[in-house]
């Protein structure tokens, strides 16, 4: 491949061609993250709590992290969301409407020692889970 005075166009075309080998470039240009994202690019989503699940923490920690399986209203996809706070799982019942958001891990992935959980519960039936756990607010009976 030439590097001469008139080789600019050829160099540019080659760069364009070889950029497709870069995983991050490909994902960004084809918007693959948004297409595969259960929240469809939105910061939060509402869903129905299907069941409570306990997920074992990764080594070297030993705990059962309390999570909830949630079926999203907008597209019917199922995700697992972490219930943040001491005893927070007790405020979430099956068939409750929960609001979920990303858990804040690196590159949109899971955080800490909870394997495969990328979302956290923010609100239950429109009331902040944090407020419920602190006892400032009561859960509404629907």
From Swiss-Prot:
GO terms for cellular component: small ribosomal subunit. GO terms for biological process: translation. Pfam families: Ribosom_S12_S23. Keywords: Ribonucleoprotein, Ribosomal protein, RNA-binding, rRNA-binding. InterPro entries: NA-bd_OB-fold (IPR012340), Ribosomal_uS12 (IPR006032), Ribosomal_uS12_arc (IPR022863), Ribosomal_uS12_euk/arc (IPR005680). Coiled coil: none annotated. GO terms for molecular function: rRNA binding; structural constituent of ribosome. Signal peptide: none annotated. Part of the 30S ribosomal subunit. With S4 and S5 plays an important role in translational accuracy. Located at the interface of the 30S and 50S subunits. Belongs to the universal ribosomal protein uS12 family. This is Small ribosomal subunit protein uS12. It comes from Thermoplasma volcanium (strain ATCC 51530 / DSM 4299 / JCM 9571 / NBRC 15438 / GSS1). The gene is rps12.
């Amino acid at each position: 491949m030439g590097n001469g005075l008139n080789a600019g166009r050829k160099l540019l075309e080659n760069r364009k061609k070889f950029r497709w080998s870069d995983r991050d470039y490909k994902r960004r240009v084809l918007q693959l993250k948004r297409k595969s994202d259960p929240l469809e690019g939105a910061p939060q989503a509402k869903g129905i709590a299907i069941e409570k699940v306990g997920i074992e923490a990764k080594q070297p920690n030993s705990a059962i992290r309390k999570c909830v399986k949630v079926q999203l209203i907008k597209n019917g996809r199922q995700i697992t969301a972490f219930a943040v706070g001491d005893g927070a799982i007790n405020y979430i019942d099956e068939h409750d409407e929960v609001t979920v958001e990303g858990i804040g891990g690196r590159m949109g992935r899971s955080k800490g020692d909870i394997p495969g959980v990328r979302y956290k519960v923010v609100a239950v039936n429109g009331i902040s889970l944090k407020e419920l756990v602190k006892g400032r607010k009561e859960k509404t009976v629907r």
